[in-house]
Amino acid sequence: VKVSGEDPIVSTTGKASRELFEVRVANGQSHKYDFLTVGSMGHASMIAYGLSEQLHQGKIVCVDGDGAVLMHMGTLAFLGKQQPKHYLHIVLNNAAHESVGGMPTGAAGQSYAAIAKACGYPKVFQVDNASSFVSVLQNAQAYSELTMIEVMVKLGARDDLGRPKETPQENKERFMNYWEEHTK
């Protein structure tokens, strides 16, 4: 979130959105920049695409899970064809559906970065540690083309991971107010 600044983040359902919410709290940042895709696994990438079509500067950051991408794999081909210029797609790959019990996705060993490249993403990266992720993420802010960063992560979340303190309706309204100002 430090690298994204005031750029909007659309995050997938489940623990990724919960982590994002808690990071904003820990950093004393507003939640207005974030659209938490609660209860809509696989739809964050297309919501982010729709927003990217209205954006003239900055980035749309989509934080997705490997299971969510797998559920709507055709989105990668669609995005590769459309080539949104302001779109940064981050895929957290733990080879499992973490938020619904950690069941394996059945796609362990598959490279989402390679799949995205085959679908037409001009820039793709796969990282497996925090320092590489930060470096690639900082560089990606300067790219004016569709970019994917696949982040290989371990299965497991903190036991004390909280939940957003606002309702999905409140999140949507706050984000829409921010978006209206951001795209003027």
Would you name each region that the model predicts?
Residues T13-S17, N94-A96, M152-A157:
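Glycine-rich beta-alpha junction loops
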Residues V1-P8:
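Active-site pocket-lining segments that scaffold enzyme catalytic pockets across diverse folds
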Residues L20-R24, M73, V100-P104, D159-P164:
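Short acidic, glycine/serine/threonine-rich loops at helix termini
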Residues P8-T13, L36-T37, C62, F125-D128, ...:
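General beta-strand structural signal in soluble alpha/beta enzymes
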Residues R18-N94:
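Thiamine diphosphate
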Residues G5, V23, A142-K184:
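Glycine/aspartate-rich loop-and-adjacent alpha/beta segment that forms the canonical ThDP
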Residues A16, G42-H43, N129-F133:
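Short acidic loop-to-helix transition motifs that present clustered carboxylates
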Residues M103-N139:
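Conserved thiamine diphosphate
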